């Protein structure tokens, strides 16, 4: 398999970099997206919540992007693909979600990393009277909250790591 998105270059790590070949070379050709330590701050502070995550797909099926931050928006499978878009305003996406699910804005919960880069999004969500669930770290686990109603998270949005975004997209697909 070949790493198409990973952590090596961004974190100055010697392994799991884009283009790295893994395996014995005699199996099927696959693409790999990997985040060896999701929740690095949890590990550094000896807290629970970190995990290792990866996505594997047929060659050419995973986004091959530079190791960088990316804008993200995730919802459960009850929202038709393409209905919401990172290029739409926060308000437009919330309105679309509200229309699709017949939920009042005050009943919608958005999960987002508590980062200064998200201050405008958080302010906009509060202005719209949307519930905001702030998390300190772990945008993979935060985004996956939308996949099960027991967590009461409707939307995950914000800016986070590229590998995590590709992995979450594969998991939710």
Functional labels for PLM-detected ranges:
Residues 27-38, 42-61:
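DPxDG-like acidic metal-binding loop motif
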Residues 9, 21-27, 35, 44-47, ...:
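Solvent-exposed alpha-helices and their adjacent loops that cap or buttress functional pockets
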Residues 2-7, 32-34, 43-45, 64-65, ...:
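General beta-strand structural signal in soluble alpha/beta enzymes
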Residues 53, 58-134:
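Acidic beta-strand-loop-alpha-helix segment within the catalytic core
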Residues 8, 59, 115, 138-140, ...:
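Short, ordered loop/turn segments at secondary-structure junctions
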Residues 138-139, 149-173:
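Glycine-rich phosphate-binding loop
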Residues 14-17, 44-47, 65-68, 121-125, ...:
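Short acidic, glycine/serine/threonine-rich loops at helix termini
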Residues 1-33, 92-95, 126, 140-141:
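N-terminal subdomain of lithium-sensitive/metallo-dependent phosphomonoesterases centered on the IMPase/IPPase/PAP
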């Amino acid at each position: 398999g070949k790493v198409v998105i990973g952590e090596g270059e961004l974190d100055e790590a010697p392994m799991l970099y884009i283009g790295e070949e893994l395996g014995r070379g005699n199996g099927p050709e696959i693409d790999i997206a990997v985040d060896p330590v999701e929740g690095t701050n949890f590990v550094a502070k000896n807290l629970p919540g970190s995990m290792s995550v990866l996505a594997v797909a047929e060659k050419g099926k995973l986004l091959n992007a530079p190791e960088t931050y990316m804008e993200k928006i995730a919802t459960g499978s009850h929202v038709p693909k393409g209905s919401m878009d990172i290029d739409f305003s926060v308000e437009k996406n919330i309105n679309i979600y509200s229309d699709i699910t017949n939920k009042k804005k005050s009943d919608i919960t958005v999960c987002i990393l508590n980062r200064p880069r998200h201050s405008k999004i958080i302010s906009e969500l509060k202005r719209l009277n949307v519930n905001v669930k702030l998390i300190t770290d772990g945008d993979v686990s935060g985004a996956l909250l939308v996949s099960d109603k027991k967590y009461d998270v409707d939307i995950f949005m914000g800016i986070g790591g590229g590998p995590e975004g590709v992995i979450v997209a594969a998991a939710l697909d």
